[in-house]
Each structure stands twice: as structure tokens, then as C-alpha cells.
């Protein structure tokens, strides 16, 4: 007799967390991505463990300067503009293919603000693109 099997394949997406670059690295961080365009102040290049630094996934210099003039007042529009930049960033698909095998991915940023920073938008963008 022939038997038919149904195989359910679920593609898992990594848990993407955000951490300040000044916090200690931890093996639980998984794949670590630096998401600031500029190297963080006060950190030696050999003192920050990271796996990837895709500068084109960071806000453009002009957008970053504009946002920093009024972070609270410009957050909503910054979010829209940054998402538009991400939609055309050349390395998006490469980054997604690099992080997909990991259970955990950590976005590293020097940003002090935890409620209004680009890493939040990038996390949501990557999660949606992988979903």
C-alpha cells in the first residue's frame, strides 16, 4: 500500500533584540549587527564584538541630522522616511539571508533613547520582511 505523508515546514524567524553597544557582549546575543553608520564613541575597534556592519541599513547622514534636530517632534515622519530608505537598501536581502539561520539576532546601537531610535524601526522592518 502506498502511504502519503504530510510534512509541515515552518520557517522560523530569529528573535531580534536591541542592545546598546556599551553593554557587555553575551553568547545569548547570537548574531550581532552594528546598526550605527559611525563607529561608537569611546569604543576601540577591537573591543566591540560584532558579526556584520551593514552601513546602508542605517539612516542616511542627511536623515540622521534632520531627525536629531527634533527627535520627539519628528519621530513619526523619521520612521516613514527611514522605512523608505530601507526599502531600497542594497544589502537588505543579503542581511536577511545571513541572519535567518540564527535563533537570536542582536542589533547594536549607541543610541541613548530607547523609545525613539532607528534600531526599533530596523527590527520591525527586518521582522516583517522575513515574516
Regions from the language model: what does each represent?
Residues 9-131:
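Residues lining hydrophobic/aromatic ligand-binding pockets adjacent to catalytic sites
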Amino acid at each position: 500500500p502506498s502511504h502519503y505523508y504530510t510534512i509541515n515546514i515552518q520557517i522560523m524567524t530569529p528573535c531580534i533584540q536591541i542592545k546598546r553597544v556599551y553593554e557587555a557582549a553575551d553568547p545569548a546575543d547570537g548574531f550581532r549587527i552594528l546598526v550605527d553608520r559611525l563607529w561608537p564613541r569611546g569604543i576601540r575597534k577591537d573591543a566591540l564584538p560584532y558579526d556584520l556592519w551593514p552601513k546602508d541599513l542605517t539612516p542616511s547622514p542627511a536623515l540622521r541630522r534632520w531627525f536629531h534636530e527634533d527627535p520627539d517632534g519628528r519621530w513619526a515622519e523619521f520612521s516613514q522616511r527611514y522605512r523608505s530608505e530601507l526599502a531600497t537598501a542594497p544589502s537588505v536581502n543579503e542581511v536577511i539571508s545571513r541572519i535567518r539561520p540564527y535563533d537570536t539576532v542582536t542589533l547594536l546601537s549607541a543610541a541613548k533613547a530607547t523609545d525613539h531610535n532607528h534600531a526599533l524601526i530596523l527590527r520591525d522592518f527586518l521582522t516583517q520582511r522575513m515574516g
